[in-house]
Every structure is written in structure tokens, then in C-alpha cells.
UniProtKB/Swiss-Prot annotation:
NCBIfam families: rpsS_bact
InterPro entries assigned: Ribosomal_uS19 (IPR002222), Ribosomal_uS19_bac-type (IPR005732), Ribosomal_uS19_CS (IPR020934), Ribosomal_uS19_SF (IPR023575)
Name of the molecule in the record: Small ribosomal subunit protein uS19c
Main location per the UniProt record: plastid
GO molecular function: rRNA binding; structural constituent of ribosome
Entry's Gene Ontology cellular component terms: chloroplast; mitochondrial small ribosomal subunit
Keyword Cell membrane carried by entry: no
Native source species: Calycanthus floridus var. glaucus (Eastern sweetshrub)
Family per similarity comment: Belongs to the universal ribosomal protein uS19 family.
PANTHER family: RIBOSOMAL PROTEIN S19P FAMILY MEMBER, SMALL RIBOSOMAL SUBUNIT PROTEIN US19M
Any Gene Ontology biological process: translation
Coiled coil: none
Amino acid sequence: MTRSLKKNPFVANHLLAKIEKLNMREEKETIVTWSRASTIIPTMIGHTIAIHNGKEHLPIFITDRMVGHKLGEFAPTLTFRGHARTDTRSRR
């Protein structure tokens, strides 16, 4: 189910504070976060946020088309290594 429209979008407090501080100073620097559940809001546009994927932080530049999505959608946690090859020699 989607989040109720009565509620505000979820953004972690520490992440929101960092973004507001950078907007006040009008600086652009990479913000490191583990909060994959935070929703992208319009004040984040133009910032680079390094999102944790379970192993490392992936830097993602926030654009206006990303507003309303979650940060975790842009940092995949799994890497597809390919399907196992079928060994035809062992079947004979």
C-alpha cells in the first residue's frame, strides 16, 4: 500500500538537517547517508547524496524527476552475476 496523503513524506531528521544546512550556505557537497527509506523532496534537488547499498556508498545526483521516489531505489543492493551455465558433457 502507498503512504496516506494525510501524512507527510518520510525523510530522516539527520538527512533533512544536513540538506537544510547546505541550502543555507549555498554549498554543494556529497552527503553520506544510510537512510534508504527517505523520500526525495524538492529541497534535495541539485545535491549529490551517497546512498549505502550494503557494501559501499553510491553517489547519486538528485534531479527533479526523482522527487517522490525513495533514495534506496537508486542504489541497487544485489548484483546479477548471470545464470549458471549448463554443462552438456555431464549429462551424457
